[in-house]
Amino acid sequence: MSRTRIYELDVFRAICTITVLLGHVSSYPVGVLSTDSRFYGLYLGVNSFCRFAIQAFLFLSAAVLVHSYADRWQGPESALAMWRKRLIDPGIPYVVWSVIYTLLAIRRGRHIDFPTFLRLLATGKAWDHLYFIVLIFQFYLLFPLLLRALRSLSCRPVLWLGIGALIQAGFHMWDQRVFAIPNRASWAVRFGFYLFAGMLAGLDFDVLQDWTRRNRWAIAAVWAVSAVLNCSVSAAIRLGTPHRLSGYAELIVNVYAVASCLFFLAVSQWVTALNGWPMRAAMGISNASFGIYLSHPLGLAMWRRLTATGNPILFHLSVWAGAVVVLALSWAATLWLKRFKFGWTLVGK
């Protein structure tokens, strides 16, 4: 496969970035509002809607990595070059932001000594969103072995996807029925299916593109049904109300996440085909996505402090205005920092 840029994946990355932001925007009112609030259901629905973002980001990262390296992989030399680029370049911003968020947590009254900080750094727990970076680092470390396995099974895609699903299901069953795994969100195997599916897609993305075009209406239908089920079950669990499907919550959220990956890939194809301002905006967000991802929780924390109010109307306005303002500022700050020699230590290269 030629190493051409796949613009649909840039649009997809922008969608994932905005979804992560919306998830963090909506989680705050879900946590502070009374369940009797008129708008509580709206915030809870938006938050539940965003539950596919990390899975989609992992799928995307795996697809991009295979697309970038599969045809030019030369064994150990390629592995070392890939690790230098993919571990060090994002690793330094990760450490810097872990320090920043640790200082923010200390300022809010949390006691964190140096050994605790090292544990937070290793597990991505310095702030709620940083565990994703740890997941990606694990995938990068295992990538040479996984790529070799993928090449052996590329002609048997169903088996490859089945192995990914079994790894993920096995992790879940072990955690639920054998031994509660510490920091379960920080283990890449928890999302094994999405990584395996992304790697398979990266081998020949045109195949997936053609399939989603042919089946776009079926994908949309499955996505809509799974979205409703995900939101209703998530709401029932959050509110502690009975729901006949509560026992299948893990399965439902995974069906929803898979359907969302396919649905928003189809949306990305449509946006790319239009080739208008939505695509240009998506490309801009995609190019700044790492900086936006790392910095936006700090922006949201500052915004909430500046706009704190007891007025219900102003509170709701500030929630949604904060999403727009923080996206714009983190995007602009990323572009600005990239102009400087050492700006990459904050926003990546």
Q: What positions do the PLM features span?
A:
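Alpha-helical transmembrane segments and terminal signal-anchor/GPI-anchor hydrophobic tails
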Residues: 208-288
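Functionally critical transmembrane alpha-helices in membrane proteins and complexes, commonly lining
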Residues: 7-70, 90-98
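Aromatic-anchored segments of alpha-helical transmembrane domains
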Residues: 22-25, 163-176, 223-236, 298
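Hydrophobic alpha-helical segments with transmembrane-like composition
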Residues: 101-177, 182, 188-195
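Interfacial loop-to-helix transition and helix-capping segments at the boundaries
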Residues: 44-55, 121-135, 175-195, 231-261
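Specific transmembrane alpha-helix
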Residues: 54-67, 137-147, 170-211, 253-273, ...
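Transmembrane alpha-helical segments and their boundary/interface "anchor" motifs
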Residues: 47-55, 68-104, 115-128, 284-293
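C-terminal "closing" transmembrane helix and its immediate cytosolic amphipathic cap
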Residues: 269-283, 299-349
